[in-house]
Swiss-Prot record, chain E:
Protein name: NADH-quinone oxidoreductase subunit K
Sequence intervals crossing the membrane: 2-22, 28-48, 62-82
Organism: Geobacillus thermodenitrificans (strain NG80-2)
Record carries keyword Translocase: yes
Primary location: membrane
Keywords for this protein: Cell membrane, Membrane, NAD, Quinone, Translocase, Transmembrane, Transmembrane helix, Transport
Pfam family, one: Oxidored_q2
Length: 173, 523, 617, 497, 101
């Protein structure tokens, strides 16, 4: 067992543990924090997979940005939040159906991936993959890149439109 | 515009003109609505008379490019070209004349409609366009198109201008016939998809020509043909209607306004006959043989079932509804015989029942209008107050029970003549229906017109009489059939007698069609 | 003249049409239209008869309807039989038209009555002229229509309504037999023409079984129309119609149509032993059966009606015994004397306004014309020698004897005894003794008496066209000379005479002289008496069997229709609507439920795929 | 880098127009004084869409073009479906122009350009030959749609709709992306053509099939077909009517575009373990067939119980998605043609119906179907138009709906063996749909009129109604108008890269 | 380390996210679970970029796009949630049930 393997197991364990903990916790803030562990674990895995740039982005965006805005959202909406409140929806049936379906789905997929192997070792991935990614983005994937910029614009405007409290003056009009 | 298009679409002019008439101007509406049914009548009669003097109906065929469904390189130019095609032969001509005649008479009888007359006439004319189109169409798509026009028009006519349970009846009509049409559409789609044409003649040729078989776009196996024919027959069995798919008919007969029932019982049910002959026997003669026995049995069941149920009804409209079921059974009997006599009988019976049912419902309309009820148990002795009306009613009953010399007999005779050749025992069982027909029609009509004047409605009569002259309460007076009602009734009786006395009138146009059909059946 | 035979039925048809259109305007004058039309018919019929005397036949056909290669024709033919029938029918009809002028005077639907009479006469003449079965069937039914309309003439009476309906339906039952037989015959012989059918019978195209079957089926039609057992029950009820109608239709013409039909198809029947036997047995049974019922009836017209049934049974017996001539002979004489009896009965009813013989009596003096004429009729029907009935009945008895059916012969003899008994019971109760009714009874006007006188003469004279003494004119005429009178044993005539006289004597003892108490039978055999009075419970039997069965089935089907057929429809629509509401309830507004459904769907698809290894369906 | 500059960007004119219009409108909205009405923005957006439509039409004769390794493709397919998308978008924007926000909210200029952005996403979906571009494009549409659904900010229903849309959309996106990741992993490329070629040699049919199912479920969210249909009624009901019209037409069209692009290109020639080893798509046909059948049944049956017009049309749109999916499941030569015709007809009949519903909602403040009662009395023409749309939706001949549905039927039965069961299900459920469509007709024509007559239709709605009615009638009576356009695309012979 | 290990991990995380998204009551958590699902997918992409059929950095690009879109979705989702919260004063997803049937 090599060092990478050990690292993989630790990181995977962290990621899964974060997820499972999240499912078990009752406090919303704790849940988010638990997921940060997962996100960080995933970032570590990206490093193992020679995707340093993605790992950095992962840390910045998920462990950072998204977690923060989620926490903000929780704070913003946390007027009567009560930790003792029920944290899961629906009845037993709903959860059972969800669990069984998810489990069945997972098993079936696992059956497919358990020995999936293309024999590639991925050594060809350049160490400076940020540059490589840049090249791809600005040549091959120019168009989707532009579209994503539009999406972000839309998300920006949309978030403002939806979240902004309409001023009194506007409502009077 | 060509002759047939003119014939089919001429009521459209009426619809357009009606749109500009004020809603309250009922006189103009009635006048215009009736007048709009005259052009098709004249044109149809013209064609009928011309065809009698050796005019070849094929000359009337029309065909224009309409739509090209697929333009793929691996299809021939003709494939999937759906054309606007009209064309008639003797068979369609008979039904067109029937439609045109009943259309005008129903428009005249619509005097009794009091509410929303404008919309009523617009839809009535639309219904007539649909019915004429169904018989004039020379291709499946247009046949279906016109068929659905009748579906929508009938739904609205029944649902808006019908009796107390009109909407239920309208929905019943819609669902049963919609299902029939849907099934028909699937069959049409299969035929069009696999042959690349919707034209009757081309389809006929393609389906029967072994050389063309190879040119089908996708194969039509022998088994598939049975399924297709089964689908067709089932679709038309709903429209006929065959027991046990008849419940909608009963409701429509009872709830729809009588002039609409004139057209419904008179023409719409006959689309089933037409369809079964034209498509069933016309396109799948060999396969039809396999179904013939079942059809004949179903026909006999229809006859007896309808007749036995008609025996028990206390509502005249119900009696007539079940009698329609019974009479349409004769059509099935004729088709099940699958010989010339049988097919001819099916057509005759359709025309005859069309006329008779129209007469019956014309009179039912008058009865409902005058007395306010058509409940047999509440009526009686009407012949005293309304002798002329009662005379017509009696004639209708006699026609219903198939009295020789009237149209109904000719249909029953020919149909049974056909079945006696192929399945005598079954035919004999069906002939028992003749007895029941006598029982139910006489029971219903005699209970209304003969016997004592019932107390229950005497007051109605008295009341009505009292309005006119307060002194004559003791002698109830109801207005007898008036001239504007008597004229359509008389025309119908005259036609019923004409067909009954000289059926060759109908047989002549049919002769060539039958011959072709019998060739298809292999002698 | 014979090529114009088609005009014979045309006159009454014109009368019908004219009266229907203008009758209300013409009122009284309507009678003359009818009388003139039938007179013209009669004259034309006589012309045809005269032409036929020349010995030629005539047939003409037109296309009625084409079915593929088959052409159904309509036309007329003149044979000895129908030329003779034309005259009989037209003649009786004419007399009844005249008689009705008096009888129906004052009825507000006077013209309608004449219109109906015209329709009936047209149909009857048309039936007689038909050269083929189909046309015969058409007129056969039209005759039924005429009868129906006339029975129901007093439409406001519930009894008339019921009687009319019953008459139509009972005869319809027979007609369906006719219909089936006719159509079967058509496919066997490819024709409806009598001649073609006879040819097929002759050359064996028609198998013996089919011959018997079709003959019996057609005979069912005759049973219905001629009021034979077991379809006779309508005929007594039909007496609800006006009396001239009873005379014309239910005595002289229509009811004889059954006999005529069998006679017209005689070669078909002759070819089948079984069919002949059936006809004979039905005829014989009906003769005695109806006669016994006639013994106890109290309605004057009903007695006559049962007597008609009985006499028609005689005719059938004659046909079944192979004596076609005897049947037609009896048909003719019966037409005259029974018409006479009915008209006379009508005259009595006209005078006393009741039909119950218990309320009559002592009318001999009050009705100086009617009473003797009735007596003539009664003597004739009773078979008293020298009256027409004697000869024709004798001929039938002889035929039955010669045919070897001894049982039927004695049955007929017994029926003859009963006939003379109940006829004279009637006579004595109505015309002798003290008057049991109040009010004045006046003799009828001349328009009524006149036809009765003519019929009275014929009730005697018509017997002499076929007698053992002067020669068998009728027989030779009907068979184109081939007829030869088979010598019947002389004792038959003697027995017949004795029997009829005994019957009269008994009636006199019981009702005239009253030495035998009237309740002799009812006292001694109350059950038997009741049995007869209730017409052997045939009507009740039908009510409790056939009617009940049909009613049961139709009630059953009504339930099937309402609950099973509609139930299935309801089930389907109910299922759809339940599915709709379930689906709608499943849409519970929970976003996560929607997701869960999706994931469950995904899982199902994936698992099925994983388990089946991709082999779907 | 050179590729970027040498590419034939003029082929993206319609997209540029839409994007430019959106940006310009956005800027105008920003600088416009607060008190000015934003309605003209919607007219401007509609004009932009029409302009783009004209530009697309002008490019019909052009040869197929591929920019940057198929990340943008302008083939017949793209042009054909862009026509529908733009027509639907333009018509929906006409509805936006007459939108009357209720419950104290005010008209929002964002509505117009958000819809343009969504339209842009849809158009890009039609034009992409690359997995990544497809994903990003459809996400542009989806994210914009979330915003559109929530635009009635003060209405709880609208908030709820947006929320449900986001949650279900997120799950769908994740599932689809999961599927895409396997497709990507098995092939190592995002170009659809390359993927197809790679897949022909793959020896992982099981994983491929799993990817197929994941993608199918993901896409079924956009199509609103079983099993991912349940969000649609809630979102359709809660969203503003013009947005609902947009979702039911443009989003659905985009979904089918995605379906065709992805599945036909990638899976048609991929190996499978199923009944047809040569084609995964064909061996998965039964799955699609079952889903299509279920969609038709559920959509039509549940619609029977709806009283809300928007909800009813939502279920009806599920049902129509079922019909379309059935057309796809048939996989006949008529597949793309018949879907195109159907979607075209659907644009006209559905937006027409929504335009009138929008008016009813504007006027009465409620979308209960009783609001239609007696419309015929006061506004006979409007009632007649709605009647026409409903008949067309029901597939009655003489309308576009029939022609379209008939072509679907042809597709279903022309294959060997034919999909007779599916055709029958389609026929029968169509009859079920008669009940609720005719129930609206009953309201229109039979019921007594309500007291207050509706105002006249405002300009935007009346334009939309007239155009839709014309379209519905034209395709119904002169179908060659549509078929001739279709023929221009050469039956999509250049569809596969 | 083999490909399948990464894929299995991704699958587990995807399933956890999916289960959480279907059962958690707090909308924020539901949204974050969706993020987790997308993250799991990204592991797939990155793993395939290294061990897939044609290893290459375009797998990373796909993952980056996915992250961007996930962020956009999260933003809009939270905005929608805040709008909802403003009107209903709750963030529990099962209380968003006024639209149904």
């Amino acid at each position: 067992m090599s060092g990478t393997d050990i690292a993989f197991f630790l990181l995977a364990l962290a990621a899964i543990a974060g997820g499972v903990t999240m499912l078990q916790l009752t406090n919303v803030v704790h849940m988010v924090i638990a997921l940060v562990m997962t996100f960080l674990g995933i970032a570590g895995l990206y490093v193992l997979l020679s995707a340093e740039f993605v790992a950095v982005v992962q840390v910045l965006i998920y462990s950072g940005a998204i977690t923060i805005i989620m926490l903000f959202a929780i704070m913003l909406t946390r007027h009567h939040a009560d930790d003792k409140e029920r944290q899961t929806t629906g009845g037993v049936w709903h959860r059972a159906v969800a669990a069984i379906s998810v489990l069945a789905f997972g098993l079936a997929v696992y059956f497919g991936i358990r020995r999936l192997d293309f024999g590639a070792d991925g050594s060809a991935l350049a160490a400076d993959n940020a540059r490589e990614i840049g090249k791809w983005l600005y040549s091959y994937y120019t168009i989707p890149f532009e579209i994503v910029s539009v999406i972000l614009l839309v998300a920006l405007i949309g978030a403002i439109v939806l979240a902004k409290k309409d001023g009194k003056g506007a409502e009077d009009k | 515009m060509s002759f047939l298009s003119l014939l089919v679409f001429s009521p459209l002019l009426g619809i357009i003109l009606l749109a500009f008439v004020r809603r309250t101007d009922t006189k103009t509406i009635q006048w215009l609505g009736t007048a709009a049914t005259v052009p098709p009548l004249l044109l149809a009669l013209f064609a009928f008379i011309r065809s009698g003097s050796g005019f070849r109906l094929e000359q009337l065929d029309e065909s224009y490019d309409w739509v090209r469904l697929a333009n793929l390189p691996f299809f021939t130019d003709a494939a999937y070209v759906i054309r606007y095609e009209l064309g008639i032969d003797g068979l369609s001509l008979l039904f067109i004349v029937l439609t045109a005649v009943l259309g005008t008479l129903a428009a005249v009888a619509s005097l009794l409609i009091k509410v929303e007359k404008k919309g009523y006439f617009m839809w009535l004319l639309a219904l007539e366009i649909g019915m004429l189109g169904v018989f004039a169409a020379a291709n499946f798509i247009w046949f279906f198109l016109f068929l659905e026009v009748t579906l929508v028009a009938m739904f609205l006519l029944v649902g808006k201008w019908g009796g107390f349970e009109r909407e239920r009846a309208a929905y019943g009509y819609l669902l049963y016939n919609g299902l029939g049409s849907a099934l028909l559409l699937v069959v049409i789609a299969v035929l069009v998809a696999r042959t690349g044409t919707a034209n009757f003649a081309l389809l006929h040729e393609t389906l029967h020509n072994p050389v063309a078989e190879g040119q089908l776009i996708a194969p039509l196996t022998a088994e598939a043909r049975y399924w297709l024919l089964g689908g067709l027959l089932l679709a038309f069995a709903v429209k006929l209607p065959a027991v046990p798919l008849h419940r909608w008919l009963v409701r429509v007969h009872v709830e729809a306004p009588p002039p609409v029932v004139m057209l419904h019982a008179g023409v719409l049910l006959k689309i089933a006959t037409y369809g079964m002959i034209r498509f069933g026997i016309g396109l799948f003669p060999d396969e039809f043989r396999a179904f013939a026995g079942a059809i004949a049995v179903l026909g006999v069941i229809n006859i007896l079932y309808g007749a036995l149920l008609a025996l028990r009804q206390r509502e005249l409209k119900h009696v007539l509804a079940y009698s329609s079921v019974s009479h349409m059974g004769v059509v099935l009997v004729g088709l099940g015989a699958l010989n010339e006599a049988g097919i001819q009988g099916a057509v005759f019976q359709s025309v005859a029942h069309g006329l008779i049912a129209a007469l019956s419902f014309l009179l039912v309309g008058v009865l409902a209008n005058r007395i306010g009820t058509t409940d047999i148990h509440r009526l009686g002795g009407l012949a005293k107050a309304m002798p002329i009306f009662s005379g017509y009613l009696l004639t209708a009953a006699l026609a219903l029970l198939g009295l020789p010399g009237l149209a109904g007999f000719v249909g029953e005779l020919t149909a049974f003549l056909g079945l006696f050749e192929t399945k005598p025992a079954l035919a004999a069982a069906g002939a028992l229906g003749l007895i029941f027909a006598a029982v139910y029609s006489l029971r219903a009509i005699l209970d209304i017109t003969f016997g004592h004047t019932r107390e229950r409605y005497e007051s109605t009569l008295g009341l009505r009489g009292a309005k006119e002259s307060a002194a004559s309460v003791s002698e109830p007076r109801v207005i007898d059939l008036q001239a504007k009602e008597a004229v359509p009734a008389f025309v119908l009786v005259a036609l019923i007698v004409a067909v009954g006395v000289y059926p060759q009138l109908l047989a002549e146009p049919l002769a060539t069609v039958l011959e072709t059909m019998m060739n298809g059946l292999g002698g | 003249m014979m090529n114009l035979a088609w005009v014979v039925p045309l006159f009454p048809l014109c009368s019908f049409a004219l009266l229907l259109l203008f009758g209300r305007k013409w009122k009284k004058a309507s009678a003359y239209v009818g009388i003139v039309a039938t007179l013209l018919s009669l004259l034309a019929a006589l012309g045809v008869l005269a032409g036929r005397l020349g010995g030629t036949t005539y047939e003409a056909n037109w296309t009625w309807m084409q079915i593929g290669d088959v052409t159904l024709t309509a036309g007329f033919s003149v044979t000895a039989l129908n030329a003779w029938m034309l005259v009989v029918v037209a003649f009786v009809s004419w007399l009844v038209h005249i008689y009705s002028q008096g009888y129906m005077a004052g009825d507000e639907r006077f013209s309608t009555f004449y219109a109906y009479l015209g329709l009936f006469t047209f149909a009857m003449l048309g039936l007689v002229l038909s050269p083929n079965l189909l046309q015969a069937y058409i007129f056969w039914e039209l005759v039924g229509l005429g009868s129906f309309l006339l029975i129901g003439f007093y439409f406001y009476k519930e009894e008339a309504k019921a009687a009319a309906k019953k008459a139509f339906i009972m005869t319809r039952i027979g007609d369906v037999g006719f219909f089936i037989g006719m159509l079967l015959l058509f496919w066997q012989t490819k024709s409806f023409d009598y001649d073609d059918i006879f040819r097929a019978v002759g050359d064996g195209t028609l198998s013996p079984g089919m011959t018997t079957l079709t003959a019996i089926l057609i005979f069912i039609g005759a049973i219905g129309k001629s009021g034979q057992f077991p379809l006779h029950t309508w005929l007594p009820d039909a007496m609800e119609g006006p009396t001239p109608v009873s005379a014309l239709i239910h005595a002289a013409t229509m009811v004889a149509a059954g006999v005529y039909l069998v006679a017209a198809l005689f070669p078909l029947y002759e070819a089948s032993e079984a069919a002949m036997m059936t006809v004979a047995v039905i005829g014989g049974v009906t003769a005695i059966f109806a006669a016994t019922i006639g013994l106890v009836q109290t309605d004057i017209k009903r007695v006559l009606a049962y007597s008609t049934i009985s006499q028609l049974g005689y005719m059938m017996l004659a046909l079944g015994s192979g004596s076609y001539v005897a049947a037609i002979f009896h048909l003719t004489t019966h037409a005259f004397f029974k018409a006479l009896l009915f008209l006379a009965a009508g005259s009595v009813i006209h005078a006393v306004h009741t039909q119950n013989i218990e309320e009559m009596g002592g009318l001999w003096r009050r009705l100086p014309w009617t009473a003797p004429l009735f007596l003539v009729g009664a003597l004739s029907i009773s078979g008293v020698p020298l009256f027409a009935g004697f000869f024709s009945k004798d001929e039938i008895l002889a035929a039955a004897w010669l045919n070897g059916s001894v049982e039927l012969f004695w049955l007929a003899v017994a029926a003859a005894l009963l006939t003379s008994f109940y006829m004279f019971r009637l006579f004595f109760l109505v015309f002798t003794g003290e008057a049991r009714h109040d009010g004045d009874a006046h003799e009828a006007p001349m328009s009524m008496v006149g036809p009765m006188v003519v019929l009275g003469v014929l009730s005697v004279a018509s017997g002499y066209i076929q007698t053992p003494w002067f020669g068998s004119f009728l027989g030779e005429w009907l068979t184109d000379g081939a007829y030869h009178h088979e010598a019947a044993p002389g004792w038959i005539a003697v027995v017949a005479t004795i029997v009829s006289l005994v019957g009269i004597l008994l009636a006199w003892l019981m009702y005239g002289k009253r030495t035998v108490p009237r309740d002799w039978l009812s006292a001694r055999a109350p059950h038997g008496y009741e049995l007869l009075r209730r017409h052997y419970y045939v009507d009740d039997f039908y009510r409790w069997t056939v009617v009940a069965l049909v009613s049961f089935i139709s009630r059953l089907l009504a339930y099937v229709d309402r609950y099973l057929v509609e139930g299935i429809v309801r089930l389907v629509t109910g299922t759809v609507s339940a599915a709709a509401s379930a689906g709608s309830r499943g849409q519970n507004g929970q976003a996560q439920t929607y997701g869960a459904v999706t994931v469950a769907g995904l899982a199902i698809l994936v698992v099925i795929f994983a388990l089946t290894g991709g082999y779907w369906l | 880098m050179n590729d970027v500059w040498q590419a034939n960007w003029s082929m993206m004119t319609p997209e540029w127009i839409v994007l430019a219009a959106a940006i310009v409108l956005l800027l105008i909205d920003l600088v416009m004084p607060k008190e000015r009405s934003r309605r003209p923005l919607a007219w401007g957006a509609a004009a932009g869409a029409v302009l783009a439509l004209i530009a697309t039409a002008a490019m019909i004769p052009a040869d197929p073009v591929s920019i940057l390794h198929d990340t943008f493709r302008l083939d017949g397919f793209a042009k054909a479906f862009k026509l529908i998308l733009l027509a639907g978008g333009a018509l929906a924007l006409l509805l936006v122009a007459e939108w009357e926000p209720k419950e104290g909210s005010h008209y929002r200029g964002e509505f117009a350009y958000m819809m343009l952005f969504a339209l842009l996403g849809a158009m890009m979906t039609a034009s992409s030959g690359d997995l990544l571009t497809l994903f990003v494009s459809i996400e542009l549409l989806t994210v914009s749609s979330y915003v559109l659904a929530g635009l009635r900010k003060t209405a709880t229903a609208s908030n709820e709709a947006a929320l449900k849309y986001v949650i279900n959309g997120g799950i769908a996106t994740a599932i689809m992306l999961f599927g895409m990741s396997y497709v990507f992993g098995l092939t190592g490329t995002t170009n659809l053509g390359d993927i197809a070629r790679e897949l022909q040699e793959t020896n992982e049919p099981y994983m491929l099939a799993l990817a197929f199912l994941l993608l199918l479920i993901g896409v079924s969210f956009k199509l609103a077909t079983v099993p991912f249909h349940m969000w649609a009624p809630d979102v359709y009901e809660g969203a503003p009517v013009p947005a609902t019209a947009f979702f039911s037409v443009v989003s659905k069209t985009a979904g089918f575009v995605l379906l065709l692009r992805l599945f036909v290109t990638i899976f048609a020639a991929a190996p499978a373990e199923g009944r047809d080893p040569s084609s995964l798509l064909l061996s998965m046909q039964p799955v699609i067939t079952v889903l299509a059948g279920l969609t038709m049944i559920i959509g039509n049956v549940v619609a029977l119980r709806q009283r809300s017009l928007k909800r009813l049309l939502a279920y009806s749109s599920i049902a129509h998605a079922g019909y379309l999916l059935a057309g796809f499941a048939a996989m006949s030569w008529a597949m793309i043609d018949s879907l195109w015709i159907y979607l075209l007809a659907y644009v006209f009949m559905n937006i027409g119906a929504f335009a009138i519903v929008a008016h009813i909602v504007n006027e009465t403040g409620s979308d209960d179907l009783a609001g239609l009662a007696g419309l015929y009395r006061h506004r006979p023409l409007l009632a007649a138009a709605l009647g026409l749309f409903l008949l067309s939706l029901a597939g009655i001949p003489g309308t576009a709906g029939f022609i379209a549905k008939f072509y679907l039927f042809i597709g279903l039965v022309v294959t060997e063996p034919g999909h007779y069961v599916l055709a029958t299900v389609m026929a029968v459920t169509t009859v079920v749909s008669y009940v609720y469509y005719f129930n609206l007709l009953v309201q229109l024509f039979f019921r007594p009129a309500s007291l207050a007559p509706l105002r006249r239709l405002p300009a935007g709605l009346s334009t939309a109604v007239v155009l839709c009615a014309l379209g519905t009638l034209a395709i119904g009576w002169v179908p060659d108008l549509a078929y001739d356009v279709l023929a221009q695309f050469g039956h999509f012979g250049d569809f596969l890269p | 380390m083999t490909l399948s290990a990464y894929l299995a991990l991704a699958l587990i995380l995807f399933c956890i996210g999916l289960y959480g998204a279907l059962t958690k009551r707090n909308t924020v958590i539901v949204l974050i679970c969706i993020e987790l699902m997308l993250n799991a997918v990204n592991i797939n992409f990155v793993a395939f970029a290294k061990y897939g059929a044609h290893p290459g950095v375009h797998g990373h690009v796909f993952a980056l796009f996915a992250i961007a879109i996930a962020a956009a979705e999260a933003a809009v989702g939270l905005a929608a949630l805040i709008a909802f919260y403003r009107n209903r004063k709750t963030v529990q997803v099962d209380e968003a049930n006024s639209l149904k049937h």
